[in-house]
Curated annotation (Swiss-Prot):
InterPro entries: Ribosomal_uS19, Ribosomal_uS19_bac-type, Ribosomal_uS19_CS, Ribosomal_uS19_SF. GO terms for molecular function: rRNA binding; structural constituent of ribosome. PANTHER family: RIBOSOMAL PROTEIN S19P FAMILY MEMBER, SMALL RIBOSOMAL SUBUNIT PROTEIN US19M. One of its GO terms (biological process) is ribosomal small subunit assembly. The gene is rpsS. HAMAP family: Ribosomal_uS19 (MF_00531). Keywords: Ribonucleoprotein, Ribosomal protein, RNA-binding, rRNA-binding. Protein S19 forms a complex with S13 that binds strongly to the 16S ribosomal RNA. The keyword RNA-binding applies. Belongs to the universal ribosomal protein uS19 family. This is Small ribosomal subunit protein uS19. One of its GO terms (cellular component) is small ribosomal subunit. PROSITE patterns: RIBOSOMAL_S19 (PS00323).
């Protein structure tokens, strides 16, 4: 279910402060906040989003505005379905 428009987008306050401080910096901003929505202020900033194991660098562009950071850092690795083990070699 989508978030109510009267509530507005959710972004962690510490992430907004880090983005404002690192406006001209090339260094990625590390965050564990996958739930934060991408705002227009974040365009052009590299944010390293935690996927449960390590941080995945995400370069934010204008097409990502309105999506959540967690959508761009995949958490599951698909190794393929089980099959005939003899034919794999």
């Amino acid at each position: 279910m989508a978030r109510s428009l009267k509530k507005g987008p959710f972004v962690d306050h510490h992430l907004v402060a880090k983005v404002a401080a690192a406006a001209g910096s090339k260094r990625p901003i590390k965050t564990w906040s996958r739930r934060s929505m991408i705002l227009p202020d974040m365009v052009g900033v590299t944010i390293a989003v935690h996927n449960g194991k390590n941080h995945i660098p995400v370069l934010v562009n204008e097409n990502m505005v309105g999506h959540k950071l967690g959508e761009f850092a995949i958490t599951r690795t698909f190794k393929g379905h089980g099959g005939d083990k003899k034919s794999g070699k």
